[in-house]
A protein has these predicted regions:
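Catalytic domains of riboflavin
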Residues: 2-183
């Protein structure tokens, strides 16, 4: 699952889970001359700690670059490719779909989901992790086609991040999956 932040990126404390040491092949992210993404160096226990790595990730996201964030082994034990919705481009979405599961989720505050009338996807959530999926969505109008293309999904993400966008600008169901953010 790939998560996209719909709120502007602020400086805040973030807890990072253990990371894999070394390099990860990727295209389109900040890379070295060989096209390899350099991951932060982990300590002997596999943790990347410290404000410096968090600040570097936030700076990258402000520039519109995706960042890999891993969760705890007792959660999903996976990495998520995250980026700011306000900076979404067709290229970022194409890369994300090509190099991940292709499921694009967008983390949003509950208040904003309520404003956009994006309620829970199901009445009874049976997800073992309790992931709070909202009704999937696409942007309406403009140059939108079916909603599935990288450019359509980028437009939808930017619209979800736009505080001026209203509920009538979206159709349900769609190809992006909002998640109700929890503290």
């Amino acid at each position: 699952v790939n998560r996209v932040l719909s709120e502007p990126i602020a400086d805040e404390t973030i807890s990072l889970a253990p990371k894999t040491r070394g390099r990860m092949p990727a295209i389109g992210l900040s890379t070295d001359a060989a096209g390899t993404v350099l991951m932060p160096e982990a300590d002997e226990d596999g943790w990347c700690l410290g404000r410096e790595s968090v600040e570097a990730a936030l700076d990258a996201m402000r520039r519109g670059e995706p960042v890999v964030v891993t969760d705890d082994a007792d959660r999903e034990n996976e990495g998520d490719l995250i980026f700011a919705a306000e900076t979404a481009t067709a290229e970022t979405l194409a890369f994300t779909v090509r190099h991940t599961s292709g499921v694009i989720c967008v983390a949003m505050p509950g208040e904003r989901l309520d404003e956009l009338r994006l309620g829970p996807m199901v009445a009874r959530n049976e997800d073992p992790k309790g992931t709070a999926f909202a009704v999937s969505v696409d942007l309406l109008g403009g140059d939108m086609t079916t909603g599935i293309s990288a450019s359509d999904r980028a437009r939808t993400l930017r619209a979800l991040a736009d505080p001026e966008a209203t509920a009538d600008k979206f159709c349900r169901p769609g190809h992006l999956f909002p998640l109700r953010a929890r503290p």
